[in-house]
A protein has these predicted regions:
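An N-terminal hydrophobic leader/cap segment in hydrolases
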Residues: 13-78
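The serine-hydrolase catalytic nucleophile loop
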Residues: 105-119, 132
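Conserved alpha/beta-hydrolase
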Residues: 120-139
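Hydrolase active-site cap/lid region
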Residues: 184-241, 247
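Short beta-strand/loop motif that positions the catalytic acidic residue
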Residues: 251-253, 258-260, 264
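Catalytic active-site module of serine/aspartate enzymes centered on a nucleophile-bearing elbow/loop
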Residues: 300-320
């Protein structure tokens, strides 16, 4: 090979490497990076985009108003990698079971979980609404689809036991990415204070939900997912393939109730079906809500949703 062809080869390789790195960075910025954002102020309200949420606009705003008017206590913890993570505690009554609640992808606690406070109070539960890393009032700039958030969740569990006492009764609750987070947390060893897990419209794995969305956007996942995964490693400093809710269910021993709207076109209903089938715990239940889109199972069928949770607690033998 003469020098000309060698330079052409080296130039081509260099171009491909540079193009791959640029593509990986673009994927990271679009999919995982979370820039600082201004949250709604007094008299301002945010609801998720899309027609399915506009139908419930009045309810979503009313729930936000409700939790802004309720008394609450602010808490914060330090993550394993030095981020300050924040949450707000809404007490139903002293000694009530406490739900540790986690929101969805690119959401924040007030927007995604306000209705959950109403549901908690109907069940006689208190609620600790938590902003994920890189979301809401918490620090950070990288969303990790539950990979690092599960470690944060476990830290919140330890904090709650210290704060509320060894006799605290705790429930891990999440919606969408928050559901994936609590499910992955449940795959590890959890203390007896955790009584059960509620996973609303969670996905089976980061890879599966990301490739599903890529297909929806008419992007080739066989090409794009490896680039996105590279971006996560290089710029987000985590591995998208490290763990998944599906893997976690193989070792989960806590009771788990899965809830999912049948007409969810973002995280398919079938994902909760498969997660429930994979769950190895003695007590598990799938709450199916016809006609509910993504994250709307409770707004669509409030009484049925609450009653299903009451029945699940009875099936598990809980006296609260």
């Amino acid at each position: 090979m003469n020098d000309t062809w060698l330079w052409i080869l080296l130039g081509s390789v260099g171009f491909l490497v540079a193009a791959t790195l640029i593509a990986a960075y673009v994927c990271y910025r679009l999919m995982l990076y979370s820039a600082p954002r201004r949250l709604p102020g007094e008299g301002e309200y945010e609801i998720p985009e899309g027609e399915i949420y506009a139908v419930f606009r009045d309810d979503l705003i009313a729930w936000t108003k409700m939790i802004r008017e309720l008394p609450y206590k602010e808490y914060s913890i330090r993550s394993f990698d030095g981020l300050t993570l924040r949450g707000k505690f809404y007490e139903y009554e002293p000694g009530a079971p406490i739900e540790l609640m986690f929101h969805g992808y690119r959401g924040y606690a007030e927007r995604d979980l306000s209705g959950g406070v109403e549901r908690c109070f109907k069940l006689g539960h208190s609620a600790l609404l938590i902003d994920h890393r890189a979301s809401g009032l918490s620090d950070g700039n990288t969303i990790t689809f539950g990979i690092l958030e599960r470690r944060d969740c476990r830290d919140w569990v330890d904090f709650a036991i210290r704060e509320f006492g060894e006799d605290a009764r705790l429930i891990l609750t999440g919606i969408s990415m928050g559901a994936a987070t609590v499910l992955m947390t449940a795959g590890g060893e959890l203390p007896p204070q955790i009584k059960y897990v509620l996973a609303d419209c969670g996905y089976t794995s980061p890879k599966e939900i990301i490739t599903k969305v890529m297909v929806d956007l008419k992007l080739p996942p066989a090409l794009m997912y490896p680039i996105a995964s590279l971006g996560a490693r290089l710029f987000g400093h985590f591995n998208l393939n490290e763990y998944s809710p599906m893997e976690a269910m193989k070792t989960c021993t806590k009771p788990v109730v899965f809830a999912h709207g049948v007409t969810d076109d973002f995280v398919p209903y079938d994902m909760s079906v498969r997660l429930c089938e994979a769950c190895k715990g003695r007590y598990k239940k799938l709450v199916t809500i016809p006609g509910a889109g993504h994250g709307l199972a409770f707004p669509v069928a409030r009484e049925d949703y609450v009653e299903a949770l009451r029945q699940f607690k009875l099936e598990c033998g809980f006296d609260f």
